[in-house]
Amino acid sequence: MIEFVYPHTQLVAGVDEVGRGPLVGAVVTAAVILDPARPIAGLNDSKKLSEKRRLALCEEIKEKALSWSLGRAEPHEIDELNILHATMLAMQRAVAGLHIAPEYVLIDGNRCPKLPMPSMAVVKGDSRVPEISAASILAKVTRDAEMAALDIVFPQYGFAQHKGYPTAFHLEKLAEYGATEHHRRSFGPVKRALGLAS
C-alpha cells in the first residue's frame, strides 16, 4: 500500500461511515481530529479489529482527540434521498458537529460531500489514515450499539448478530414477520417483503 502523504496543514479531520449496506437503521458517520501530542496506538480499519479492541479504542479516541463528532441519516432520509446522498448528508453533519473547525477533511472512499473547507477522498483511508481509522471505529461502535438496542425491541430479527445486513437469516425473518418501522423501505429486499416491488 502506498503511504499516504498528508496535506500541509495542522487541523486534519478524518471522516468515515458505517451502515450503507444494511436493510435497517441509520447510516452513521464520524469525524475526528486527532491530537498529535496524544497518539493512539493500534488504530486500524474498524472491520479488522475485534469488538473488545474497538470498544477500548473508542473510549481512548473520545478521551484523546482534539474534537470528535457523530453524524447520521435516518432510514426515512435514506429512502427519500437514496443511500449515497444520505451518506454524504450524514458526513456533512459529522463535520459540522466538530467543536473545532478542521482546516482540511479526509474522507474514506472515492467521493467527498460538499464541505466549507478543502477535502479529499482517500481510497482505503480507514487502513491508511489514522484520523479516518478513528472515525471508522467511533461510527462502528455507535451503530453496533444501536443494533444491539434494536435487537432487544425486535428479538426475532437477530439484529445484534447481523447488524441489519441482508443475511439469509435476516431475509428469512423479514419474509416471516414483515418490516419494522426501522427498515429502509427503498431497499429491494424490504420492498419485496412489503409487497411494494414492481
UniProtKB/Swiss-Prot annotation:
| GO MF, one example | RNA binding
**Pfam families from the entry?**
RNase_HII (PF01351)
**What's an example GO BP annotation here?**
DNA replication, removal of RNA primer
Please share the entry's free-text remark on the cofactor.
Manganese or magnesium. Binds 1 divalent metal ion per monomer in the absence of substrate. May bind a second metal ion after substrate binding.
Superkingdom to which the source organism belongs: Bacteria
Positions annotated to bind a divalent metal cation: D16, E17, D108
Enzyme Commission (EC) number: 3.1.26.4
Please state which protein family the record places this protein in: Belongs to the RNase HII family.
Q: Which PANTHER family match?
A: RIBONUCLEASE H2 SUBUNIT A, RIBONUCLEASE HII
- State the function annotated in the UniProt record: Endonuclease that specifically degrades the RNA of RNA-DNA hybrids.
Protein's UniProt name: Ribonuclease HII
Q: Which organism is it from?
A: Escherichia coli O6:H1 (strain CFT073 / ATCC 700928 / UPEC)
Gene coding for it: rnhB
